[in-house]
Amino acid sequence: MARSVWKGPFLDGYMLGKADKARASGRNEVIKIWSRRSTILPQFVGLTFGVYNGQKFIPVLVTENMIGHKFGEFSPTRTFYGHAVDKKAKRK
């Protein structure tokens, strides 16, 4: 079920301050965040966030197409190695 419109988008409180500081400094440095559940807002377009996936920070450059999505969608937590190959079928 989607979030109610009257509540507005979810965002951890510290993130707006970090984004404002990064934009004011003018340097394009990675902003480290642990909040995968936060919604991407229009103010974040053009900034690079390091989204923690449980092991390391994955750099995510925010574009206009990402607005309204969650940060966790762009930082995968699991590695897919492929399905096991049947050795008997491969020999034929």
UniProtKB/Swiss-Prot annotation:
GO terms for biological process: ribosomal small subunit assembly; translation. GO terms for molecular function: rRNA binding; structural constituent of ribosome. It comes from Paramagnetospirillum magneticum (strain ATCC 700264 / AMB-1) (Magnetospirillum magneticum). GO terms for cellular component: cytoplasm; small ribosomal subunit. Protein S19 forms a complex with S13 that binds strongly to the 16S ribosomal RNA. Transmembrane segments: none annotated. InterPro entries: Ribosomal_uS19 (IPR002222), Ribosomal_uS19_bac-type (IPR005732), Ribosomal_uS19_CS (IPR020934), Ribosomal_uS19_SF (IPR023575). Belongs to the universal ribosomal protein uS19 family. Gene3D superfamilies: 30s Ribosomal Protein S19, Chain A. This is Small ribosomal subunit protein uS19. Keywords: Ribonucleoprotein, Ribosomal protein, RNA-binding, rRNA-binding.
